[in-house]
Amino acid sequence: MSISSSNVTSGFIDIATKDEIEKYMYGGKTSTAYFVRETRKATWFTQVPVSLTRANGSANFGSEWSASISRAGDYLLYTWLRVRIPSVTLLSTNQFGANGRIRWCRNFMHNLIRECSITFNDLVAARFDHYHLDFWAAFTTPASKAVGYDNMIGNVSALIQPQPVPVAPATVSLPEADLNLPLPFFFSRDSGVALPTAALPYNEMRINFQFHDWQRLLILDNIAAVASQTVVPVVGATSDIATAPVLHHGTVWGNYAIVSNEERRRMGCSVRDILVEQVQTAPRHVWNPTTNDAPNYDIRFSHAIKALFFAVRNTTFSNQPSNYTTASPVITSTTVILEPSTGAFDPIHHTTLIYENTNRLNHMGSDYFSLVNPWYHAPTIPGLTGFHEYSYSLAFNEIDPMGSTNYGKLTNISIVPTASPAAKVGAAGTGPAGSGQNFPQTFEFIVTALNNNIIRISGGALGFPVL
């Protein structure tokens, strides 16, 4: 039996190996001593979450609603939307009878949002939609937080798995739930670009929401259908559900930093420019691989583009919006297979990006946009099928400029997404039974961009020195 041993004396042998390469890497006046830590002091502050209680409109399905940003704190660090979704009971009189199953769509909190924006005296400083929320979550949510994020936005079995007519003692099919959506505005990315609310006394600051109708979010399935039969539930005492769902307790929360009196006095003393991020969404296009498997779409963006995000969305069923594959979900009596293994593939085979009459990217495979580019330039690689990104930045999630291209200076910008064989099968509806492709699928092409811009804080108001 051997006995493990080691002693300090052997370490001096390592120290004695210092030569020319080591002289290049170690020593000198600017070298770091790893065993004597220097404390980097910070200004004195505290932080506190605050509910933004001043609101206009109704925080309900299909409505517009806005919350006023309070100036009670000095800096707004981040915000999130919190809502309570109601319980839903599938009636025994539903159109599919015992074969009826009800569920909410995947990414409920994403798809609740038609558009969200932040305004300063009606000047829109930033906006995003549910497409960007899908892209942003796919490429930036680390694996260690993915389960928690899914819980926040409603991706839990009790809400998105098919539920039958309740059997006593149960009284509801889908339970009531409190859900949260982190709002990915520019000031939430880093405390160094926090919104200086105390320095903006002359701005009426609002976070504005346009919510989708519940019909886009609630799904009634027929588990006995040969081809998936998904419909919007009908409201009525002897129909599918007794009453239309209503949101409750819609609230925007903000996390504020409160600083010292000295720092607060300095906030409004000089002009301050802040590099921020904005989101742009190009008009959506119908994508039909049976008539044109390589369509050419114009994309018109402006400012310094850090990254492009694009996908082909499966639009076969309007109330299943977060589906970017070649197949519809397959429903069984107890579960929904969101990405059936025999049918759910990437609709795009390869993509060409063109501008200035030059192929910037020529016939690049989807594996590059879904795997290789995110591996090097994004915080994470999507776990779901169908997401693509191209980053001009070394790391598009970094606040500091690390690469971009000014699309406002380019002409004739277009993108050509070429259909995969699976997309053609899906569009024709010739897939095998249980594949989600055994009936015709419809699609649309979506492309969004992340860009940099500059905001200026001056004279107690916010503006854009470069529009």
Swiss-Prot record:
Entries under InterPro entries matching the protein: Capsid_N, MCP_C, MCP_C_sf, VP_dsDNA_II
Keyword Transmembrane included in the entry's annotation: no
Entry's Gene Ontology molecular function annotations: structural molecule activity
GO cellular component terms, semicolon-separated: T=147 icosahedral capsid
Domain of life, source organism: Viruses
Main localization (coarse): virion
Keyword Transmembrane: no
One Pfam family per UniProt: Capsid_N
Subcellular location: Virion
SUPFAM superfamilies listed in its UniProt record: Group II dsDNA viruses VP (SSF49749)
Keywords tagged on the record: Capsid protein, Late protein, T=147 icosahedral capsid protein, Virion
Similarity remark: Belongs to the NCLDV major capsid protein family.
Function comment: Major capsid protein that self assembles to form an icosahedral capsid with a T=147 symmetry. Represents around 50% of the total virion protein mass.
Subunit structure: Homotrimer.
Protein name: Major capsid protein
Organism: Invertebrate iridescent virus 6 (IIV-6)
